[in-house]
C-alpha cells in the first residue's frame, strides 16, 4: 500500500513538471534557453548588414554592385559573330542536295536536276540561293526546294547573272551576300529538259570545235547569221479577227511606213497572222467549243471563220502587189500564217497617169513647134485630132478600169461585212 502511494505521488509530480514545461519552454529546455539567443542574434545581424560582419573577404571582394569593364573590339566582334551564328545553327541538320533521291520523273529530268545541283555547287558551296517568286526574291537553301519538288510536273532553271558569271564560274565562293547568290526559278519539266538538251548540244559543239571540225564551224556561222537576220527583221502582227476598216486604216499605213523607212532597199519584213498574242498557234477547232452547244453550229462557225480569213489573205496579197513587193507564205490558215515580204523598189506616191500625160503633152508641143516650117498645116491638124482621139479613148478605158476596181472593192467589203454580221449573229445565238 505504501509503495502504491509513493508511485502515485511521483507520477503526479512528473505530470505537473511536463505540464509546466509545455507552458514555459525556457524552463523545460535549458539548452535552448542558453544557446538559442545567440543564433537569433546572429541572424538579426546578417539581415541588417546584408552579410556577416565576421566575413571580411566577402565584403572586400563583392563584385555584384561594381560595374563591368568595357569590352574590347575583339570581344565585340566575337559577340556579333555568335549572334549571327545562332539563327544559322539549324543549317547543320539540312540534307545535302546531292543525297536527295527522286522517285518520280524521267531519267532526263533527273539528269537535268543533277546538272543544276552541280552548277549551283560551283557557284555557291553552301547551296544558298535566291528563289524567284511572285512576291519577289526569297533567300533559302536548295534542299528545301528539292524536297518539295515534283519532277513529274515542275523543274528548276538556273539563271545566269551577266555581272557575276566571269567571277563565279572560275572559283566557287562561300559568301552569303544576296548579290552573289545564284538565281533559281521553278518552271515546267518540259522547259527544263529542253534547256538541258540545248546545254548538252552546246557542250558537244565546243568539244568538236576544240578538235578542229570544219562542219561545226560552218553550222555555227549559219546559225549566227540567221539570228542576226531575225534580230534585224521587223515584224507586223495581225489578228485573224481584224475588221476590214481596221485593216485599211491601220495595217496598210504600217506596211507603207515600214517600206518607206527602209527606203525600198529590199529589206525583208514579216507579217504574222495569228489568233492572239498569247495563243499564236491556236487551232481553229478549239475556238468555238465553249461557245457552241452542238457540232452543227460549231462547223458553221468554223466555215464562216475560214471564209473571213481567206478574204483577209486576198486583201493583203492585193495590197502587196500594189506596193510592188514579193512574198512567200509559211504556215496554215487553221493556225498561223507568216508572210515573208521583200519590197522590189521604192513605193510610188504619185499616180503614173498624171505624170505621163504631162510629159507627152510637153513633147508633142515641142515637136509641133519644130515641125511647123517643114510640114503642111492640114497634116498637122490631122495628126493633132488623131492624137486627141487616142488620148480620150485611153482616158475612158482608165475610168472604166477604176470603176470596175471600185465595184470589186465594194463587193469585197460587202462580203466581209456580211460575214462579220453572220459571225457575230452566230456567236450571239
Curated annotation (Swiss-Prot):
Belongs to the AIM23 family. Residues 36-50, 75-91, 404-413 have a biased composition (Low complexity). It comes from the Eukaryota. It is found in: Mitochondrion. The keyword Transcription regulation does not apply. It comes from Candida albicans (strain SC5314 / ATCC MYA-2876). Residues 365-377 have a biased composition (Acidic residues). This is Altered inheritance of mitochondria protein 23, mitochondrial. The gene is AIM23.
